């Protein structure tokens, strides 16, 4: 589970096409990987991914074709950076709202409207 609060922002992303989908490597700070373990969950742009391996300033993930079809992870690069979040730990303040990061489908935005003159209560 995640809180939806971005903890890290990375513009250094390497992608390698694989038969199963994509190998993703994201540069992070040492602070972000402190206490991280192989198999931990990290949200990348809100998508729950499993840590394949990591170094103090680099995390590696495998992303399968289905996840690439339903998310924007295939579009990540230095021009489309990633928002990152570590999974919640029992007893930590949530500070946002509970988010699973498990993607079931995608939607198409049909229109937007300017809400500048609207009040919400």
Locate predicted features.
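Single conserved hydrophobic/aromatic residue that forms the stacking wall/gate
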Residues: 111-121
